[in-house]
Amino acid sequence: MRYDHIEEGDPEIFELMRRESLRQNRTLDLIASENLASEAVLEATGSIFTNKYAEGYPNARYYGGCEVADQVEILAIERAKKLFDADHANVQPHSGSQANQAVYLAFLKPGDTILSMSLAAGGHLSHGAPVSMTGKWFNIVHYGVDPKTETIDLNEVEKLALEHKPKLIIAGASAYPRFIDFQGFREIADKVGAIFMVDMAHIAGLVAAGVHPSPVPFADVVTTTTHKTLRGPRGGLILCKAEHAKAIDKAVFPGVQGGPLVHIIAAKAVAFKEDSEPSFKEYSAQVVKNAKTMAETFASKGVRVVTGGTDNHLMLLDVTSVGLTGKEAEELLAEVGIVVNKNAIPFDKLPPRVASGIRIGTPNITTRGLRDEECKLLAEQMSELFITKSEKVKAEIKGLVQELTERYPAYKGWS
């Protein structure tokens, strides 16, 4: 892609864009929540729809001139519904967190009880962490994971639900590598008369491709981001049963947002079309295969993998098992051109800014074209670096990263 107008009119921003392009192309990104949007998605994101204000919904706008914007939003809605086999879709949320806020507004009043996964166990800030708006406005009860298996214990979830009678039960996480029993959660929600919400932001692409169980048949409402495994623009999406459609739409607008971002909705529509192609199913299957390969390799080399493996696109490594903190491991990998994030692990004794683990994901490198054989080699060398911390191994991995990034560029023609 060319940026002639930016280069001419704002050389400072152009230089930063050039540097970011170099960074993305010359490093391997193993951050589980990041991916590479297609150039078609990027074009839509920067399209002329940026200029259009469109408060309201298709055929019910508060501004004139929305005839084409209506068609864009309708197309995005229909594509999302078909992709996930959902009754209703709202494509206006600006982010996953705002999608979650809209759900809370639709079903709850301040002080109502939410039962959700704790941040420490792998949940998300927006599900009721004390520092978040959700944690301040609602009564939050958290479930965690079993100390031995490090997986969700539905018996604990049911016990807490029966004790606290939540109005809303949330399943979904930001750092959980295993399948979630959505049907089991549904049964618990029914026992206490709770709304059941799933935040599938991390796994949405895998769900769309059919390589991960779908929460849509079981949940009253499902939220997600549209980037991550969906490879779309940064944004949010809400899916729900038909009976909740009016409440959800009213909560999004005028509840938590004003005008939608029509250019982002156009980019979402482009991504949803891409996600419906057979090639996306192949890609998503490879994402999971790559993640399983890396997790198995780390474990075989003596790096402890939280829960013992993965069922999706991510894994958590307990790097204290090789004498590192998460912060140290993140910095060590950055030196050789591998990008990860430090991450707390269940029952972590270290503070979040240090952490005992790192989170690793395969969506980005799989989009570039890496397959299980390269992922195995990468995990082997990363493990050796964790254990030896030697300059010789650093040099070897730098060479591997250079070889892989040149063989599999993030964007062809970009450098």
From Swiss-Prot:
N6-(pyridoxal phosphate)lysine: residues carrying this PTM: K228
GO (cellular component) term, any one: cytosol
Span of the signal peptide: none
Cofactors (names): pyridoxal 5'-phosphate
Pathway involvement of the protein, from the record: One-carbon metabolism; tetrahydrofolate interconversion; Amino-acid biosynthesis; glycine biosynthesis; glycine from L-serine: step 1/1
Superkingdom of this protein's organism: Bacteria
Keywords, in A-Z order: Amino-acid biosynthesis, Cytoplasm, One-carbon metabolism, Pyridoxal phosphate, Transferase
Plays an important role in substrate specificity, annotated site positions: H227
EC number: 2.1.2.1
Subunit structure: Homodimer.
Lineage: Bacteria, Pseudomonadati, Coprothermobacterota, Coprothermobacteria, Coprothermobacterales
Protein known as: Serine hydroxymethyltransferase
Family of the protein in this entry: Belongs to the SHMT family.
